[in-house]
Amino acid sequence: MLYLTKISNAGSEFTENEQKIADFLQANVSELQSVSSRQMAKQLGISQSSIVKFAQKLGAQGFTELRMALIGEYSASREKTNATALHLHSSITSDDSLEVIARKLNREKELALEQTCALFDYARLQKIIEVISKAPFIQITGLGGSALVGRDLSFKLMKIGYRVACEADTHVQATVSQALKKGDVQIAISYSGSKKEIVLCAEAARKQGATVIAITSLADSPLRRLAHFTLDTVSGETEWRSSSMSTRTAQNSVTDLLFVGLVQLNDVESLKMIQRSSELTQRLK
């Protein structure tokens, strides 16, 4: 029996940790080539030995054998699917019913949230919130879907009194970056961490003495190396994607947590401003 089939059919037989491993492997099967048992263990908050035992439970000698088998199965499955159906997004194909599509999308987003939340270092997150709270000026950078996440965060921060710039034009982003000062904060949102526009802005911000906070993936990247602080996000999306759906879900979970943390830090005044904002917008109706 194929390992992917074994994993799908044995759900009720898995322990809590084994189910975490199974969910991760199914969601990230297209990216297993670059995943080690150590990385998995850190990301899932379990021991490496648990991963090895999981592989052996399925009949493999160890994680390496299981990983290579899964990669082979995924490649063969993709070739077969390519001949009969069009990939629409991630694992969703033109043969799927709307019910199946809904289940796949929901599971993809659930996994992105679960795996991102599992990575949070709350002491570091608290430090980041304190740094942002003291910033005279905040710049948020991002491209495409990440820019939408950034714009949403900028609206939330402005509502509670922060001075924020979040421009869609990359030339304006670069111009703002070079004008930052010591004490200012740049929040750079990029899942890949390698977009040249975002990296250029981060370089400029660091040069000016600003603090760079990156919301990015676990992968080593130019942005990750430039940042003073990183907030990690996980997305199970593959190269077969029509839009960064679960990536945005993961990023939004981080930015929403930052916002609520900042509200909590100055709760009385923040709630007053939120109330005033609500009253003003009600008058526009």
Curated annotation (Swiss-Prot):
The keyword Secreted does not apply. HAMAP family: HTH_type_MurR. CDD domains: SIS_RpiR. GO terms for molecular function: carbohydrate derivative binding; DNA binding; DNA-binding transcription factor activity. PANTHER family: GLUCOKINASE, HTH-TYPE TRANSCRIPTIONAL REGULATOR MURR. The lineage of its organism: Bacteria, Pseudomonadati, Pseudomonadota, Gammaproteobacteria, Enterobacterales. This is HTH-type transcriptional regulator MurR. Gene3D superfamilies: Glucose-6-phosphate isomerase like protein, domain 1, Winged helix-like DNA-binding domain superfamily/Winged helix DNA-binding domain. Keywords: Carbohydrate metabolism, DNA-binding, Repressor, Transcription, Transcription regulation. Residues 128-268 form the SIS domain. Homotetramer. Residues 37-56 bind DNA. GO terms for biological process: carbohydrate derivative metabolic process; N-acetylmuramic acid catabolic process; negative regulation of DNA-templated transcription; regulation of carbohydrate catabolic process.
